[in-house]
Amino acid sequence: MNLNIYKEIHFIDETIFPLNAWYSDMGSLVNKIYSHFHDEMEIIYFKEGGVIYEIDEIPHKVDEESILFFLSVVYHRATLFNFEKHTNYIFVFNLSIINSSVYDFCSNKYISPIINNEVNFPFSINSNNSYFEELKNSLLKIYDLNSHIVKLIATFLPNELQMV
């Protein structure tokens, strides 16, 4: 079976900051996210609504006020429920932004195992976790900062190249 047909390709402009971040209110448009995987890590903060994610064919119910983590090359799909009010923030980035090309103890011990998918990373964190609010607020700050950077750069582009 050719799994590359499920590969989702993301364009990440690494000249600015190697991260894509966007807000989604897709519940009013679609209630399924079809099977795919990608080379980048993905973090999704579900603000409203719920979803059943199938990760490597195993279903996981995720309610609002949850944060999901997908390491690179993890096969996943989803079905939304409560989709009349489904909103989320999505962050996709290449794990190379946290990796150093110079060997050091911290990279070798902590970062490399994440990049090489050798760590059992938590799949989701919900509002019952003590660190949920701090992580959620950090993600929202990253989203705001990314939006401001994109808008700032767009002001220097000719009108025909602006996408914002």
Q: Regions from the language model: what does each represent?
A:
Residues 2-20, 75, 79-143:
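A hydrophobic/aromatic-rich effector-binding and dimerization subdomain
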Residues 1-67, 73-74, 108, 119-122:
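Generic protein-terminus/edge-of-domain signal
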Residues 140-150, 161-164:
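Basic, amphipathic alpha-helical hairpins
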